[in-house]
From Swiss-Prot:
InterPro entries: Ribosomal_Su5_D2-typ_SF (IPR020568), Ribosomal_uS9 (IPR000754), Ribsml_uS5_D2-typ_fold_subgr (IPR014721). The lineage of its organism: Eukaryota, Viridiplantae, Streptophyta, Embryophyta, Tracheophyta. This is Small ribosomal subunit protein uS9y. One of its GO terms (cellular component) is nucleolus. Belongs to the universal ribosomal protein uS9 family.
Length: 146
């Protein structure tokens, strides 16, 4: 049996707080789908433009040759959007590094880093856990002397 040639694909993830987005990027026609539906239908609209930032920064011509399928889980609306945009940017950089050329990958990376570092680098901040003796992580219960 003849084996089929391997599809040119990369898989990258983005994280923000508890939200995780995994992007599967392969050669295609420029389609971007988020949880099975086109990215153009994402609600709320204000956050949709945040997702489109990598596309708007780099131009549609760089996304024309690739299809992206994104799975986003966890977190709230905003943190999920930040995870999605990070995974899109990281997937495109990885695809260009692996299947196109190093020069165009470097150009893409420079454009993204100049605009916003969080497009490629994860934010390590996490929620601090609650301790005893108070209602939250740092706040203490009120103390009475009389």
């Amino acid at each position: 049996m003849a084996t089929q040639p391997a599809k040119e694909s990369v898989q990258c993830f983005g994280r923000k707080k508890t939200a995780t987005a995994v992007t599967y990027c392969k050669r295609g026609s420029g389609m971007i789908k988020l949880n099975g539906s086109p990215i153009e239908l994402y609600q709320p609209e204000i956050l949709r433009f945040k997702i489109f930032e990598p596309v708007l920064l780099l131009g549609k011509h760089r996304f024309a040759g690739v299809d992206m399928r994104i799975r986003a889980t966890g977190g709230g609306n905003t943190s999920r959007v930040y995870a999605i945009r990070q995974s899109i940017a990281k997937a495109l950089v990885a695809y260009y590094q692996k299947y196109v050329d190093e020069q165009s990958k470097k150009e893409i990376k420079d454009i993204l880093m100049r605009y916003d570092r969080t497009l490629l680098v994860a934010d390590p901040r996490r929620c601090e856990s609650k301790k005893f003796g108070g209602p939250g992580a740092r706040a203490r219960f009120q103390k009475s002397y009389r």
